């Protein structure tokens, strides 16, 4: 395997940038994919979270761009706003020496500002399909014309993008792009699903090289959890889950650890955030009902160490670069075993040890059995937390804090704000049309 990025064909200036960022040797997915993509092949790259997929496509795109630096050179589509912002940060850091221009096109940000940035033809656009589709529909040819010349299209977390929920928006995005024979298409994912794999065998345009498919550490059914990850569980009645959570977070082993606590619902995330703050934990949250500025600030606080605990829905479980997490807690058990694997992929990265603890009740047993079958590993019983300890140390305080948190949310009409936010999203396209009128006024 190549020992340096220079051996892979990465530009000298970029190799130096990687060295400056303490990224010395390419990972398996980078070593396999970069040379093949530089040959002109489309690519499907499958590797578990934390294996360096972003650099695998960013390094080669920046290498090629530096030889012909026009805009818009590449489009990266990704399912979440947070992931788009993170990818943009990595592009900006890698391309700092060459003064690259990156535009992020996601919901929750100023539509007019995005329109003006797109009109300036940035070198790279990183977008969520819904917001980019909105611009294609409503912002006019001057705004999106640069997308007609792109050399690279990247679908990051391709398994999610190819699901039904993104179908119509993705198709609309494709209408503005060059035909497949005039661009390279790169798909990267932690889960190489049948839908992703089927793209390899689609008919190719004349002269197009075969698609390159590479999977790393596929393990059982295409996904493996890190070998340095310990998976544990605690079996509890549902009405004392919060007390068990606080007891786990106060264990001597974890009292100073960074932790991500995953939940299935935004309401649960908000209750836990407020409850844990009342119990004097340093906590932040990340869920879809938060305004974009709050979500960004929460992630920055957690990364900077201002918050030790991040309460998150699955919006945070895919691809987000939170390298120092030592503990993952599944407060709620996901219905899909793959979501469990992506969640626990937040810890035990790059050979470091990490723990994943699942708080389970009677209704979760079937889900846990499916997860254990998927990862080919039995979870171990968590030691150090039992009924007596929880009753004596945490139950009353957690119950009181939860009740106060829910009363606060009721006073602030949190549930009503959720309904308003849903209505806003439902009328997003008409909103885009209104914003288009504002753009015309700005230009006139």
Curated annotation (Swiss-Prot):
A motif (Q motif) lies at residues 3-31. A motif (DEAD box) lies at residues 156-159. It catalyses: ATP + H2O = ADP + phosphate + H(+). It is found in: Nucleus, Nucleolus. Residues 402-444 are annotated as: Disordered. Keywords: ATP-binding, Helicase, Hydrolase, Nucleotide-binding, Nucleus, Ribosome biogenesis, RNA-binding, rRNA processing. Residues 34-210 form the Helicase ATP-binding domain. Residues 434-444 have a biased composition (Basic residues). ATP binds at residues 47-54. Pfam families: DEAD (PF00270), Helicase_C (PF00271). Its EC number is 3.6.4.13. It comes from the Eukaryota. Residues 402-418 have a biased composition (Basic and acidic residues). GO terms for cellular component: cytosol; nucleolus; small-subunit processome. Residues 244-390 form the Helicase C-terminal domain. GO terms for biological process: endonucleolytic cleavage in 5'-ETS of tricistronic rRNA transcript (SSU-rRNA, 5.8S rRNA, LSU-rRNA); endonucleolytic cleavage in ITS1 to separate SSU-rRNA from 5.8S rRNA and LSU-rRNA from tricistronic rRNA transcript (SSU-rRNA, 5.8S rRNA, LSU-rRNA); endonucleolytic cleavage to generate mature 5'-end of SSU-rRNA from (SSU-rRNA, 5.8S rRNA, LSU-rRNA). Its main location: nucleus. GO terms for molecular function: ATP binding; ATP hydrolysis activity; RNA binding; RNA helicase activity. Belongs to the DEAD box helicase family. DDX49/DBP8 subfamily. The Q motif is unique to and characteristic of the DEAD box family of RNA helicases and controls ATP binding and hydrolysis. ATP-binding RNA helicase involved in 40S ribosomal subunit biogenesis and is required for the normal formation of 18S rRNAs through pre-rRNA processing at A0, A1 and A2 sites. Required for vegetative growth. This is ATP-dependent RNA helicase DBP8. It comes from Lodderomyces elongisporus (strain ATCC 11503 / CBS 2605 / JCM 1781 / NBRC 1676 / NRRL YB-4239) (Yeast). The lineage of its organism: Eukaryota, Fungi, Dikarya, Ascomycota, Saccharomycotina.
